[in-house]
Amino acid sequence: MQEFTNPFPIGSSSLIHCMTNEISCEMLANGILALGCKPVMADDSREVLDFTKQSQALFINLGHLSAEKEKAIRMAASYANQSSLPMVVDAVGVTTSSIRKSLVKDLLDYRPTVLKGNMSEIRSLVGLKHHGVGVDASAKDQETEDLLQVLKDWCQTYPGMSFLVTGPKDLIVSKNQVAVLENGCTELDWITGTGDLVGALTAVFLSQGKTGFEASCLAVSYLNIAAEKIVVQGMGLEEFRYQVLNQLSLLRRDENWLDTIKGEVYE
């Protein structure tokens, strides 16, 4: 396993602009605070640039789209591209919605630092066969061999972008590196918003100067390792959700948490 540099303690309390959905915004805000940064969530086109200009990273999540939000997303993404602001785009629901898929493809022109999605979403986006329903990945879409080759090709077209593909095994692909990471637990599927949270944590690590590849590996591993520490048989949904946020604030105190990352990194 490649030696990643511990991002903690956070050097500066960065402002993370999350253009996300109403369902998971509270979890994302608390997750960002738990790592030592500050969240803001503005998706009104009349003010979106005011907040984006003050931010150190931008997270765009398509989980609850509207015409007004799309307008604001395009404005923020354009600014991020022009000002070299790190940007994460989470392609939620592109397996089902042609509007969302079209928007994500347009956002590629703004050169996001990280493009995130589950296995079905990313397969759909790059033109591979998929079985995703709604915003959920299908167990039939977990084969990575064909996807990996296509993503390597896409990284030649978008050399500054990394792909973060979540699943039972998380796949992170950049122009020069590939990671297959294996931390996590099925209990994370019990509660909504954990996938969105990975994107927000990626933005946090980008705000600290990490590359798209490093930030993606750190974010998905951090959440998964935090969850592994609290898996208790018989725990109810609300208690598990509470403990996830609790562990996000505690794990950063462990100087050796990086040693528990499972998986491989290839050059």
Curated annotation (Swiss-Prot):
One of its GO terms (biological process) is thiamine diphosphate biosynthetic process. It is an enzyme of class 2 (transferase). Pathway: Cofactor biosynthesis; thiamine diphosphate biosynthesis; 4-methyl-5-(2-phosphoethyl)-thiazole from 5-(2-hydroxyethyl)-4-methylthiazole: step 1/1. One of its GO terms (molecular function) is magnesium ion binding. ATP binds at residues 116, 166. It comes from the Bacteria. The keyword Ion transport does not apply. Its EC number is 2.7.1.50. Transmembrane segments: none annotated. CDD domains: THZ_kinase (cd01170). Pfam families: HK (PF02110). It catalyses: 5-(2-hydroxyethyl)-4-methylthiazole + ATP = 4-methyl-5-(2-phosphooxyethyl)-thiazole + ADP + H(+). Substrate binds at residues 41, 193. Catalyzes the phosphorylation of the hydroxyl group of 4-methyl-5-beta-hydroxyethylthiazole (THZ). This is Hydroxyethylthiazole kinase 2. It comes from Streptococcus pneumoniae (strain Hungary19A-6). The lineage of its organism: Bacteria, Bacillati, Bacillota, Bacilli, Lactobacillales. The gene is thiM2.
